[in-house]
Swiss-Prot record:
GO molecular function (one): exo-1,4-beta-D-glucosaminidase activity
Name of the protein in question: Exo-beta-D-glucosaminidase
Originating organism: Hypocrea jecorina (Trichoderma reesei)
Pro-sequence residue ranges: 19-28
A cellular-component GO term for this protein: extracellular region
Subcellular location: Secreted, Extracellular space
Gene name of the encoded protein: gls93
Cited InterPro entries: Beta-gal/glucu_dom_sf (IPR036156), Beta-mannosidase-like_N2 (IPR054593), EBDG/EBM (IPR043534), Galactose-bd-like_sf (IPR008979), Glyco_hydro_2_Ig-like (IPR006102), Glycoside_hydrolase_SF (IPR017853), Ig-like_fold (IPR013783), Ig_GlcNase (IPR041351)
Phylogenetic placement of the source organism: Eukaryota, Fungi, Dikarya, Ascomycota, Pezizomycotina
Family designation: Belongs to the glycosyl hydrolase 2 family.
Stored SUPFAM superfamilies: (Trans)glycosidases, beta-Galactosidase/glucuronidase domain, Galactose-binding domain-like
Amino acid sequence: MLANAIAALLLGSGIASAAGHGSPLTSKAGHRAVIPDWDLKSSSDVSKDLGGLSKPGVDTSSWYHAGTSRCTIMGCLINAGVYNDEELWYSDNLNHVNWGQFSVPWVYRHEFALSPAKGKHFLLQTNGITSKADLFFNGKQIADKEYQSGAYAGRTYDITNLAAKKNALLVQVYPTDYLYDFALGYVDWNPYPSDNGSGIWRDITIKETGSVSMGPVSVLVDIDVPVEKNPARVTVRAEAQNLESHAVEFNAAAVISGNSCSGEALKQTIKLAPGEKKLVQFTQTIKTPSIWWPKQWGDQPLYTAEVTFSVKGAVSDTAQTKFGVRKVTSFVNQFNDTQYSVNGHPFQVIGGGYGADMFLRWDSERFTRIVEYMLDMHQNTIRLEGKMEHPELYEICDEYGLMVMPGWECCDKWEAWAYNDELAIFPPPVWDANDYETANYSMIHEAAMMQPHPSVLTFLVGSDFWPNDEAVVLYANALKNAGWQTPIIASASKRGFPALLGPGGMKMDGPYDWVPPNYWYDVEPSEDRLGAAFGFGSELGAGVGTPELSSLRRFLNQSDLDDLWKNPNKNLFHMSTNASSFYNRKIYNQGLWKRYGAPTSLDDYLLKAQMMDYEATRAQYEGFGALWTASRPATGVIYWMLNNAWPSLHWNQFDYYLHPAGSYFGTKVGSRIEHVAYNYQKKEIWVINHSLYQTGSRNIKVELIDMNGKQIAKKLVQVRTKANSGFKAMDISSDINKLSSVAFLRLVLSDEKGSVLSRNVYWVTKTIDELNWDESTWYYTPVSKFVDYTPLNTLATAQVSVTTSGGKHLPGIPGSQTRTVTLENKSSVPAVFIRLTLVDSKGNDVNPVSWSDNYVTLWPHEKLQLEVGGWDGSGDKIQISGKNIKATTVKL
């Protein structure tokens, strides 16, 4: 290892990007600047004299040029125009990329100017290189691949003695092997990227300081419950390091600003011996703090902490961070299930598992849209399994009020424990001393990055398997030293746990492939009911997420499209990897064929798929919501998955192009803040309330009609809702059991003033899908007898009119273009599963888009108003289709 490497990464704020050699990259002490772009080339095509290549003035005109500060090799090549992701995604084109070119190291290079002078120091900071690299600066090697190892192991190098007016940085990145390197793998989520994610996927920065440098700023907030009535004790910390060979005295100052803060500086004078490091901390009490809440529960006020180190009256280093006042705790209940609490209130985790872009490209605007989609679906948490992304992610979640559940990933080097018998190789490549060091610095870096953010709910130091005792001590110490204050969870499964942390309290028993809606309510006996709605399900779902035709045509050719409905058991490239259990839609399609009937066309298949997807996600979230306060509570649910790394045929709540379809709106309905739901298993009506304070009298209107529109039953019941709970309101089994065919069940929840809080329509029969629990696998439970929804194929045609008018700009319907869409069923039969799509003047989908509701079913002669928000203002028409209506298009 190289002696000039500083052990801890210096994180801070105020990062700027500068380009060109004319002006210095950094301008003053405390300034951090990003290396703005890269020239890159395969090591097989450049000189072996890397030291020489790292000197200024080398001709790189024949190299690829990537105009971005962070990119894997493939990401860089796409940026440089060598590849186009629309072409890569199409059909099986990804399989035809020359993977061999990535079997050798690649070289990244950038030249920049600095202004060295006496008293100035320059620090080079890596934040994420996948997965190992040699670093050269101005002709000298400053790190080797043994030291700069691990995708998350940020390191800091003092380059002061090498800095000149003209400088060159060269990074040689080595090929990544997920089983042997600490990287960002995709397991069975999708095909692997051609380069296995190798490259500079996070920014490299140059920081200018004076004699004393500053480490990451952390903020510890201590507050008692009830948080609304207590002061907050805030401690701001940062490590100071003397970079000189002589003692230095410096002044440290911190300013905390925000509501109820005076803004006065807290000051200290400190003396450091040569090279000495010391933790500097300041404490202030905020008497009446503004509390940060998850979005569904309140506002997201943020405070700012700014720390400055000065030597002889001049700034030596400075940084600031935002933070929030909130309190997160957890406990493992009597059933060995983890339950979280936020600000003293039981917090049911409702969310999805995030998928990073296949080539690890970050887009803040796109992620913001994803967060807004999640909040529109009434989700409160996003799980990051080994995909911790960038500081911007946490800043966005802080601002929007979405909780984040980060942690290490499964199934590769991160979990290469002697007791892990589920890796792709055996015996596992267990960690050596260098691996433990890499893991340690990975945790140090990530803990420092995430610590101040109020959106961070927890950290999972394991996913499928728990870390061994040596690793867990490293992880726990790194988190503790960073000032970590939220729960540390051993793993996302119940396979085992380290004594230091205790049980993780999360289950990972599937399903990952299709199961029927009643699965979630079939909770007894719980020891045999796997993923049903009890406990904390860390990753589970019916595997649905079928894109609509407009999206499918962007990545499938005609033969691929035909396979969807003509070859239901065929392996499909746009599913999982070719070695996984999820490489086809066989299980899903069996359910579709048996329940809805063999499709007669691609359009028919896709409509039936959207009905399958809608009922699947709705039932999952309703089941967990209804049983949140059951005798064995359903404490958390993470749908597998939220989104995909590329255009995929499954495992998403909206597709790669941000088009929301059946799985999205099933989730949105099933997760409503106040909701009324049908328990398929017991044929009961349940009331769900995810709010903190919304209570009082509620009316539930229950109506059951047959396929001809004839009323079978009608009931009105009044209940008193309970905040943050789910409870049974009534039993309708006697009505359901009388059915002779498919019927429609409409549930409407209203408040005392008659305002509709939730409207929900089901297609039901007197039977339910019969699950064969004894034959369950780790990824699904088979169905021994399917319900029969094929009578839906004989529905009489309904006539529906569609009109549009100026929008109401309802909360939750963002966009520059908001309209009201009024649907009216002018028939005596129900209009079933009406889908609406906002398109532009050319007929292309407008994405992202917000709908107050979609895929709706109308009673005979019912009128329903929906709101639509077109985000970019390009909406021109609305396309309407459904199970038993004629497809039409109306002008917006």
